[in-house]
A protein has these predicted regions:
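Flexible helix-coil transition and linker loops at the boundaries of alpha-helical arrays
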Residues: 2-5, 42-49, 80-85, 122
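TPR-repeat structural position
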Residues: 28-29, 69, 105
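Amphipathic alpha-helical segments of tetratricopeptide repeats
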Residues: 38-42, 73-81, 116-119
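TPR/TPR-like (Sel1-like) alpha-helical repeat modules
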Residues: 39, 100-123
Length: 145
């Protein structure tokens, strides 16, 4: 896999870290602006870059936390076209949560099961119990709190 040159990688990383700090402060709009600025620096085709995976994950996670589940679904779905995204438990968790909140329960169950299989019940520990309870209604052996 090709790698970004060091200077570009550092610029992207700095913008991403700035976005992360804004998320910590609850400034989701500001964070999204930083993440998209970083994403715009990726050379085309952007889907070739591992940095694109974590940037799209950050965007989708931020969408989820701000309650913009449609954008979260769309951005996390797009993230699946980037390196090492399919099978990433966190990406599947957030995509499943967005699908759940949008009422797309079959898709939610599929994504949440992928998250559970890849990350185990520990992945759900800091999440609202409703997601694991829901998954327990769709699959045997899922222990909900």
């Amino acid at each position: 896999m090709a790698e970004l040159d060091d200077a570009l990688y550092e610029r992207i990383g700095a913008l991403s870290e700035a976005g992360d700090a804004l998320v910590e402060d609850g400034d989701y709009a500001g964070a999204l602006e930083k993440y998209w600025q970083a994403f715009a620096l990726l050379p085309e085709p952007r889907t070739n870059w591992e940095a694109g995976t974590w940037l799209m994950a950050a965007v989708g996670d931020t969408n989820f936390h701000q309650g913009d589940y449609e954008a979260g679904r769309d951005n996390l779905g797009h993230a699946m076209h980037f390196p090492d995204a399919i099978g990433n438990p966190f990406l599947h968790l957030r995509l499943g949560q967005c699908q759940f909140e949008l009422g797309n329960l079959d898709r939610a169950a599929d994504e949440l099961m992928r998250a559970y299989m890849g990350g185990g019940p520990e992945l759900f520990e800091d999440e609202d119990d409703k997601y694991l309870r829901f998954l327990g209604t769709r699959a045997e052996g899922i222990k909900a709190p």
